Amino acid sequence: MSNRTVFFISDGTGITAETFGNAILAQFEISPRHVRLPFIDTVDKAHQAIRHINHTGELEGKRPIVFTTLVNMDILAVLKAQCNGMLLDMFGIFVAPLESELGIKSNHRVGRFSDASKSKAYDERIEAINFSLAHDDGQSHRDLAGSDVILVGVSRSGKTPTTLYLAMQYGLKASNYPLIPEDFERRQLPPALVPHRKKIFGLTIAPERLSQIRNERRPNSTYSSLANCRNEIHEAEAMMRREGIRWLSTTTKSIEEIATTILQEIRPERLEY
């Protein structure tokens, strides 16, 4: 049974909704299509999500299943009132309604997963992690073409933890490459990155936060001074604008939020599987 779509909706990254929903769905012998809709944090976004869900139901001729971890009650109320899918809140009772909706009995086994698919996904993630480690901080130019995404930004802007999270959570081969003063002087991307421009995504950060982070590593140095951080960030953002590189600020975002935002931009299909 595969012609059924399951949505995971959250006003955050959606990881909790997806994890919880998948734990419930693993009790059933089905292989549905998964769609994660993160950052549904306004009524307008809720309406967009509702249109997506309802349209999917019309196309498939079956109600989509919708797991949600929405915290905002106004947004949740809109979803409950207008969504034609089977809506399951995190705090509801899940298994019994799914038995009724799917027309099959739950296996009632804890932690039941498809061994073959999980093994393949596990192998892909290990391969992605090894790739990301080998291509951390520009240490290898070899096989950059094999990257799913190449993160660029100044030192300590969050590139390494984000690439590793993308590899571990999504199996993406994520490289990262530092932008350094020599690049700013040449006013060009590092030569190794030029052929892969379409795969590049930039990270920036508030100079004050960057200075704080760098001071933990190299206190009272030119490298960590606020003036130097301001200059590097200014030059890096100017380069990204010149090169037409998409970028975001990591200043107030968690690694999960950064990774999910990047995924939405460069590989939205990875939110469906």
From Swiss-Prot:
- Reaction equation(s) it catalyzes: [pyruvate, water dikinase] + ADP = [pyruvate, water dikinase]-phosphate + AMP + H(+); [pyruvate, water dikinase]-phosphate + phosphate + H(+) = [pyruvate, water dikinase] + diphosphate
Question: Which GO molecular function entries does the Swiss-Prot or TrEMBL record give?
Answer: ADP binding; ATP binding; phosphotransferase activity, phosphate group as acceptor; protein serine/threonine kinase activity
HAMAP family with a match to the protein in the record: PSRP (MF_01062)
Protein keywords: Kinase, Nucleotide-binding, Serine/threonine-protein kinase, Transferase
Which residues does the annotation say bind ADP?
153-160
Q: What does this protein do?
A: Bifunctional serine/threonine kinase and phosphorylase involved in the regulation of the phosphoenolpyruvate synthase (PEPS) by catalyzing its phosphorylation/dephosphorylation.
The entry sums up its family as follows: Belongs to the pyruvate, phosphate/water dikinase regulatory protein family. PSRP subfamily.
Quote the Pfam families the UniProt record gives.
Answer: Kinase-PPPase (PF03618)
Question: EC no.?
Answer: 2.7.11.33, 2.7.4.28
Matching NCBIfam families: PRK05339.1 (NF003742)
The protein in question is named Putative phosphoenolpyruvate synthase regulatory protein
